[in-house]
Design a protein with these regions (language model features):
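The substrate-binding groove and active-site-proximal loops of carbohydrate-active enzymes
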Residues: 166-174, 220-236, 254-262, 302-320, ...
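Extracellular and organelle-lumenal recognition/adhesion modules and their flexible linkers in secreted
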Residues: 1-198, 202-235, 253, 269, ...
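Noncatalytic carbohydrate-binding groove/subsite architecture in carbohydrate-active enzymes
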Residues: 149-159, 316-441
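Carbohydrate-binding surface patches
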Residues: 507-539, 572-578
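An active-site-proximal structural segment forming one wall of the substrate-binding cleft
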Residues: 169-189, 236, 243, 263-302, ...
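Aromatic/acidic polysaccharide-binding cleft in carbohydrate-active enzymes
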Residues: 18, 26-27, 419-511
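Active-site groove signature of glycoside hydrolases
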Residues: 155-158, 195-196, 281-315, 371-373, ...
Length: 581
């Protein structure tokens, strides 16, 4: 029976609250099909060739060369007499007892046109008359029924241009699903990073200040992985202001990524002034006129993975000079902000990092570090460079991280003392569904982050990402809380404590202990498949909870949260114990 040795007398360091940040990137199913209340894919009809992607259309013409006619400056369609458009999707889901709203923005091209739209069998009909206006908004509400995989239709008698459509729960929160927000609330994120990630290079913050129906869709077709679940486009239904409202609702600190590609110094200065400026400033006044007090965003990421996707800023000198320009301009708007510069540990980009740092001449507060254990999301057992389940069992076994070793021992060898690291993206892999193996990897990774302050100067961390990539699985009208979400929730009991040394005489137990004065809190990860009973040398166990998983694989996702009566941790599972002397 393994003994746990707790070295309270040796002291330690404060467990950082900021280990529990998350990313909310506009990508894949994180927003559309996840956080967003919108149920219609490609609702502004931007994506597609001869027909708009995701829509079955009859008697129509797709207009691609007259974007200024559309209120959102997108592509649109003209439906001839008897023409129709239809979309069927698992995202179209309603529940009995809830109210929903359907909208369409149209322009009759005959003297009158009859427009019928809504859920199949629940459509309402409007007769619209040409009046010289650029568009006519149509709107109605209806009571839901229990429906999964629904169909939305729009048909025309006469002729009309259709610019955009919408279907969502009427009780949305700034365009977001309240049930997903409540599930996020239970995770207790301390900070939220937005809009990416790679999406930052496709997000026009000024565009996102318009009313949602006027926002030009974002084109992500240059990155196959970015908007892959929404036909390489995003309709920008959730913008900067909505993001801040979410942070306030969740009592989470907002963090923002400024694009090296989209922002020069003046644009970045205006952005910071809009977010943090006094109402007497030009852009602070614009924010105040929209009804928002200062956002007080403290941490700003300057660029994201420019070495991979930076276009002209894949050149390290150009990236450094633009970074200097942005930081100087941003701190002109608000000298109190903190900035994080974008670096990498990747073997093929280490010369890039050395060259980049040669040209950085502006003070910064953090260096960014992205930590994915696997490489591609669609492989699991060693293919395409993915870490195997066997390799995962030995991750961080000695508290060592070769990527951060590069930062400490090479890149900043002579100047690491003041460096603070922000692990602003971490997970087993981006774009991957929850599984028992992913949970196990996340548990070891979160332990490492919590214990890495002294060795690697880790001050902050942001999980990538909670919605549909490991924590919360959203399908139709349901939201499932996954094992990693429970891990985050239970690990919160370490907050406010002092991390103290602890060890075991069993090599397969990974331990983290915090001292809270009147009690200790201990989390234990079992690296192997054999259940292990433990003793805690004279401490009374007052609470004992386990996240117990089933088969250890990327294909299995069975787990339970169990109140244990004894200190036993099962294979590839995590045990949490509150201890009293």
């Amino acid at each position: 029976m393994p003994d746990i040795h707790l070295h309270r007398e040796k002291g330690g360091y404060l467990f950082e609250d900021h280990a529990f940040g998350v990313n909310l990137e506009i990508t894949r199913k994180g927003f559309f099909g996840g956080l967003s209340a919108e149920m219609l894919n490609n609702r502004k009809l931007y994506a597609g060739g001869d027909a708009p992607s995701g829509w079955e259309c009859t008697a129509f013409e797709r207009i691609t060369d007259r974007p200024l006619e559309s209120l959102c400056h997108s592509r649109f369609i003209i439906l001839r007499d008897g023409g129709s458009m239809k979309q069927t999707s698992e995202v179209i889901a309603t529940e009995a007892g809830k109210t929903y709203e359907a909208r369409a923005w149209v322009k009759p091209l005959t003297d009158t046109a009859e427009i019928a739209f809504g859920l199949a069998g629940r459509e309402q009909t409007f007769t619209v008359t040409a009046n010289g206006e650029a568009y006519i908004p149509l709107f109605f509400t209806f009571e839901g029924t229990d429906l999964d995989g629904g169909t939305f239709t729009l048909t025309v008698k006469g002729e009309a241009a259709v610019f955009e459509v919408s279907l969502r729960d009427a009780d949305h929160f700034y365009g977001m699903r309240r049930d997903v927000i409540e599930a996020l609330r239970a995770v207790c994120p301390t900070a939220i990073r937005f809009p990416g990630g790679c999406a930052a290079d496709h997000f026009d913050w000024k565009e996102s200040l318009k009313a949602p129906e006027f926002r030009v869709p974002a084109d992500g077709s240059s990155k196959w992985f970015l908007f892959r679940d929404s036909y390489d486009q995003d309709t920008l239904d959730i913008g900067l202001n909505e993001f801040i409202m979410l942070c306030r609702e969740l009592n989470a600190e907002p963090e923002y990524t400024v694009s090296l590609i989209l922002s020069d110094g003046e644009d970045a200065r205006r952005l910071v002034e809009y977010c943090n400026g006094d109402p007497t400033t030009e852009y602070g006044a614009k924010r105040q006129a929209l009804g928002f007090d200062p956002f007080d965003i403290h941490l700003w990421y300057v660029g994201n993975e420019a070495y991979f996707f930076g276009g002209e800023f894949q050149n390290s000198q150009a990236a450094a000079l633009r970074t200097n320009e942005l930081i100087r301009a941003m701190k002109q708007a608000d000298p109190t902000i903190a900035t994080a510069i974008g670096l990498t540990w990747g073997y093929g980009y280490r010369d890039w990092c050395f060259d980049f740092m040669k040209y950085i001449d502006t003070p910064f507060e953090y260096v960014s570090y992205h930590d994915y254990i696997g490489i591609l999301p669609d492989a699991s057992q060693g293919d395409n460079g993915m870490a195997t389940t066997e390799i995962l069992e030995d991750n961080f076994r000695d508290g060592d991280c070769f990527g951060l070793n590069f930062y400490r021992d090479m890149l900043f060898k002579e100047s690491f003392a003041p460096i603070r690291v922000c692990v602003d993206e971490w997970n087993y892999s981006w774009g991957k569904d929850s599984s028992n193996a992913l949970f196990f990897s996340n548990a070891l990774q979160l332990h490492f982050i919590a214990k890495g302050k002294e060795t690697y100067h880790i001050d902050r961390a942001e999980f990538f990402m909670p919605v549909n990539e490991g924590m919360l699985t959203v399908k139709g009208s349901s939201v499932k809380t996954e094992s990693t979400a429970h891990l985050f929730t239970l690990m919160q009991s370490h907050r406010g404590g002092t991390v103290i040394p602890c060890d075991s005489d069993h090599p397969d137990l990974d331990l983290l202990c915090t001292d809270h004065g009147d009690h200790l809190f201990l989390s234990v990860v079992n690296r192997k498949s054999t259940p292990l009973d433990m003793t805690t040398e004279g401490y009374e166990i007052t609470d004992c909870t386990e996240i117990r998983t089933g088969a250890y694989s990327f294909e299995s996702n069975d787990f339970e949260v169990v109140e244990n009566t004894a200190p036993t941790v099962h294979g590839h599972s995590v045990l949490f114990m509150k201890l009293a002397k």
